[in-house]
């Protein structure tokens, strides 16, 4: 694949305390209380994720869950349980459409959310974020046998770009390349089918999501990086959403994520779910939200 990029691991400065396995102590009265730590201690955690995104959050025909977000979330809650000497909790998965994420957290319908949840200033006003646990960029999905599209600029010749109703990625491309034609569909899966049938020439969203589709339908699609002036077209930092101002749980999540990088679990999750060619680049460390001020 063009522009293949070596995966860059986060956690360049993993804390010595985490590597040494120092135990994090939850509040003494967490049992019977509210919030993520209480849910883990009590043995039942409700986690929000996507049900329809291959490689990230997917409900399988046997009702099991799979995907990168699923693996990360399961690792985090089990790691927090281990740190505190608790049994691994039972996880109840809850389908979490993008538009409902903050509401589900605020209403207490989920204890945490890992669902391609990009951290941004507006969302940070409503919920706390653990992470970021990965950085991804906007990219294109095209048919494997269509050699017309090798770069972003190749779209600017009247080609048709799939746009999901209410989403912004395709419009961002249109703003830069006026020659692009947008075709709207309700879901990304509908875009994928339209692309497969030749009704559109490309679709765009986060590279992680596109690699999931490419992995699911190997040989049919390929992912094209999008750059502008030599830089990624956009940056999207994925986080784990929890109740606003739950600092203790946020710190516990970040410690679990640091361990996940240090023991190699994240690299394994990434490759298993999104394939060897997944161009996901990690930068920074969990707990570093300085990008919100950029």
UniProtKB/Swiss-Prot annotation:
Pfam family, one: SBP_bac_3
Annotated coiled-coil segments of the chain: none
Subunit-level organization: The complex is composed of two ATP-binding proteins (GluA), two transmembrane proteins (GluC and GluD) and a solute-binding protein (GluB).
Keyword set includes Lipoprotein: yes
Subcellular localization: Cell membrane
Function per UniProt: Part of the ABC transporter complex GluABCD involved in glutamate uptake. Binds glutamate with a high affinity.
Stored PROSITE patterns: PROKAR_LIPOPROTEIN, SBP_BACTERIAL_3
Domain of life: Bacteria
Record's GO cellular component terms: extracellular region; outer membrane-bounded periplasmic space; plasma membrane
Primary localization: membrane
UniProt-recorded name of the protein: Glutamate-binding protein GluB
GO BP: any one term: amino acid transport
Membrane topology category: Lipid-anchor
Lipid-acceptor residues (N-palmitoyl cysteine): 27
Keywords, sorted A to Z: Amino-acid transport, Cell membrane, Lipoprotein, Membrane, Palmitate, Signal, Transport
Gene3D superfamilies the record matches: Periplasmic binding protein-like II (3.40.190.10)
N-terminal signal peptide: 1-26
Lipidated sites in chain (S-diacylglycerol cysteine): 27
Family: Belongs to the bacterial solute-binding protein 3 family.
């Amino acid at each position: 694949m063009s522009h293949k990029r070596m995966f860059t691991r986060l956690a360049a400065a993993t804390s010595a305390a985490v590597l040494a396995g120092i135990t994090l102590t939850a509040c003494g009265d967490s049992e019977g209380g509210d919030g993520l730590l209480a849910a883990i201690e009590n043995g039942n955690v409700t986690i929000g994720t996507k049900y329809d995104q291959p490689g990230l959050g997917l409900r399988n025909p046997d009702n099991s869950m799979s995907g990168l977000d699923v693996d990360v979330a399961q690792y985090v809650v089990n790691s927090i349980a281990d740190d505190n000497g608790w049994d691994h909790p039972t996880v109840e998965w809850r389908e979490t459409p993008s538009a409902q994420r903050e509401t589900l957290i605020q209403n207490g319908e989920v204890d945490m959310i890992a669902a391609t949840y990009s951290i941004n200033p507006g969302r940070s006003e409503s919920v706390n974020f653990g992470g970021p646990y990965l950085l991804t960029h906007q990219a294109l999905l095209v048919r494997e046998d269509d050699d017309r599209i090798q770069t972003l600029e190749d779209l600017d010749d009247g080609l048709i770009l799939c746009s999901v109703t209410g989403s912004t990625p395709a419009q961002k491309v249109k703003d830069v390349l006026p020659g692009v034609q947008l075709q709207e569909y309700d879901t990304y899966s509908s875009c994928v089918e339209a692309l497969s049938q030749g009704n559109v020439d490309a679709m765009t969203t986060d590279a992680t999501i596109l690699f999931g589709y490419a992995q699911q339908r190997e040989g049919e699609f390929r992912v094209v990086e999008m750059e502008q002036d030599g830089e990624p077209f956009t940056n999207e930092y994925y986080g784990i959403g929890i109740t606003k101002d739950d600092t203790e749980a946020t710190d516990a999540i970040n410690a679990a994520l640091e361990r996940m990088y240090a023991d190699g679990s994240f690299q394994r999750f990434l490759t298993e779910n999104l394939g060897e060619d997944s161009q996901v680049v990690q930068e920074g460390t969990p707990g570093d939200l300085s990008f919100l001020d950029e």
